[in-house]
Amino acid sequence: MSSKAARRRAREFALQGIYQWLLSANSMLLIEEHVSQVSGFDKADRELFISLLRGTLNNVDDLQAEFAPFIHRAVHELSPVERAILLLATHELKHNLDTPYRVIINEAIELAKSYGGTDGHRFVNGVLDKLATQLRVTEVSAGRS
């Protein structure tokens, strides 16, 4: 399996864990244990999964504060899937600087298409495009010139 596919799977499993946490408020370690037992997890990049899940869940309030200005409703009113995707992608934009912002946004859009509501991917795209201009100023500017 390619590393790209393994990374995509890691994001999918991290999304599942974040979603689970949003709905259950179970401990991060319990969720990590549960998700790692799901069929197909062996094909995911385990290190990336752990980094994404822990990094996101340890910083939920800060991450939400980053994207909140770009949504037109309270964060808790978002669907759990959209909220989980925004948390995950915001974490990556802030902390995984070796991953290009366009890759992060595209991966988030794909997650929203697979797991979100009908137009959830458009919403996610709009929020993350705006957020990227703040968190990745130099990279976004270079890409637009």
UniProtKB/Swiss-Prot annotation:
Swiss-Prot/TrEMBL keywords: RNA-binding, Transcription, Transcription antitermination, Transcription regulation
Record Pfam families: NusB
Keyword Zinc attributed: no
GO BP: any one term: transcription antitermination
Gene Ontology molecular-function annotations: RNA binding
InterPro entries per the UniProt record, alphabetical: NusB-like_sf, NusB_fam, NusB_RsmB_TIM44
Keyword Cell membrane part of the UniProt annotation: no
GO cellular component: a single term: cytosol
Alphabetized HAMAP family for the sequence: NusB (MF_00073)
Function: Involved in transcription antitermination. Required for transcription of ribosomal RNA (rRNA) genes. Binds specifically to the boxA antiterminator sequence of the ribosomal RNA (rrn) operons.
Cross-referenced PANTHER family: ANTITERMINATION NUSB DOMAIN-CONTAINING PROTEIN (PTHR11078:SF3), N UTILIZATION SUBSTANCE PROTEIN B-RELATED (PTHR11078)
Protein family membership: Belongs to the NusB family.
Protein name stated in the entry: Transcription antitermination protein NusB
Species of the source: Aromatoleum aromaticum (strain DSM 19018 / LMG 30748 / EbN1)
